[in-house]
């Protein structure tokens, strides 16, 4: 069975092996201290350190493995209390945004710049898409999430906005069935978001972990570090939005509302770099 100890060990081992081939992520050092809320984070940035490819690959493998562990821990019969539920919802949203970010990064690195290229990747399905980016062993595990995807174009134009719609199916191990996630962006989004101020988020203190709602995650927070790889100096805004959405999904009436957040450009206040919304099919 999927949730047996042997199955989990096998999947995590496959994730480690396949993820060790990923050598493209930067490893810098920044320490982040927080007080009680996410908006009060102060970043102390260290000078850039020489990239160590072996360390980079190991860090990436660790982050992927931890995300996979959350999938197992969030199975409905393992939920224990509202904090646990909030943590599962939060990690689910982190997973979707991380997968989306790595999709754009994969397309850029392989010079697949057309809408058709993106549609082809999205058409593979969530698990197969993840497998194409990180390796088949990882993708097979993520297939159990039973997520379907499609691209839509709400506005016409040469640089038109795109929205990735991700739908959780009835057979998903994530208990948010009939949930639609809408991630809207344009072709410049990743470049705009991923600006780095010479470092990466690597450490959060225990108090900040509780403030973010990560009730059962190590204070080192590799998932947050992975988000910083994609969202750079906008990570704080993204985390704030993720926390808001996680709290919404923790309410029994979440199906009756359309909730989300937008990340605005700091250079062009009227420009939306990224928007994320979650809602039930009943609101379509």
UniProtKB/Swiss-Prot annotation:
Keywords: Cell membrane, Glycoprotein, Membrane, Signal, Transmembrane, Transmembrane helix. Its main location: membrane. Residues 25-84 are cytoplasmic. Residues 1-24 form the signal peptide. The chain crosses the membrane at residues 85-104. Residues 105-284 are extracellular. GO terms for cellular component: plasma membrane. The keyword S-adenosyl-L-methionine does not apply. The keyword Transmembrane helix applies. It is found in: Cell membrane. It is a single-pass membrane protein. Glycans are attached at residue 270. Present with 396 molecules/cell in log phase SD medium. To yeast YNL019c. This is Uncharacterized membrane protein YNL033W. It comes from Saccharomyces cerevisiae (strain ATCC 204508 / S288c) (Baker's yeast). The lineage of its organism: Eukaryota, Fungi, Dikarya, Ascomycota, Saccharomycotina.
